[in-house]
Amino acid sequence: AENGCSAALILMSGLDSGVLATAERLARDRGLTVLGAITKPIDILTLEKLLELVPLIDRHQEVSNSGSMVDKSDFSVQELTQAVSQGQIKPWFQPRINLADMAFVGVEALARWQHPVKGMIPPDRFIPLAEESGLIDELTVSMVEQSLAEVARWQTENLTLDVSINYSALSLADLGLPDYLAGLVAARDLKADRVTVEVTESSVLTEIQNSLDVLTRLRMKGFQLSIDDFGTGFSSMQQLQNIPFTELKIDQSFVKRALSDKDAKAIVETTVDLGRRLVMSVIAEGVEDLETLELLKNYQCNQVQGYFIAKPMPGNQILEWATMWPSVASGYTG
């Protein structure tokens, strides 16, 4: 990292997978590109899958260098402010599937910034800047209003879906959020129980007192509450009992390694079991192949999302995708 290495890395070790997972996390935290980590003896098929990603990584780096994808240092707070006010940042939607019957049941709204000059800017490039500059509330309001408008439009076309919307720690400090969101849902003729507020473990910890208040009020108004990236933060089991969450989302870092890493597999299985015992729905994100889908189905995970199902897409593509999905899903059932 100190020498500015841009090569894609594959970590291998004969040590236990816990040590390897820590090394992988440290490498990523230092800005290194890590395709994956595998334990010895090496599984050839796993290694081949990782090596197949190299051309994609190289292509991404070429695109980054050409300026189509940009770092947050490449644009200003003024540009971001203008983007929010002009509607350049829009929600894209990633479908979520119910594993019991493979039905299309919901979407997660994800922010995408279509810059008029610099092209598509991913959320990890501008969300931190929005938080640092105080724009996150304005951005969140825009995302929520656009997302609910799309959900309402789909509903008029006889497609009723749940929608999950991400909220930051700063937004959770706003005691007016529950009333605002309830009014917005009512104005769109939507039901509160079809709207899920997603928060990360770290978000809850950042503003613990206000977060508990706001989350409790949201739940009392009928909204679903999801703890995102479960297993990657530092929350205790006590918090799961104290906060009225209705859903757990297993972080994709565990899901993607479930087939090759026994510890990740155990975490996935245990999380599904924990959610079931706490009467919470469990969602697995980052499903990228049929084998992982089948594993999660065997564990009785409730819902999944990931590139194997569909990549995030603009709202105007959802109706067409919904029409196409049943024929695709029929190949995975039976």
Label the predicted regions:
Residues 44-52, 56-84, 330-334:
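CheY-like receiver
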Residues 179-183, 209-214, 262-269:
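Charged helix-capping and loop-helix junction motifs
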Residues 9, 163, 245-248:
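Hydrophobic/aliphatic anchor position in the core parallel beta-sheet
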Residues 2-8, 15-36:
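Alpha4 helix (beta4-alpha4-beta5 surface) of REC/receiver domains from two-component response regulators
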Residues 3-10, 31-34, 137-138, 160, ...:
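His-Asp phosphorelay/catalytic-motif detector in bacterial-type signaling
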Residues 14-15, 33-51, 60, 169-173, ...:
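EAL-family c-di-GMP phosphodiesterase catalytic domain
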Residues 72-190, 202-203, 216-217, 237, ...:
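Bacterial c-di-GMP phosphodiesterase EAL domain
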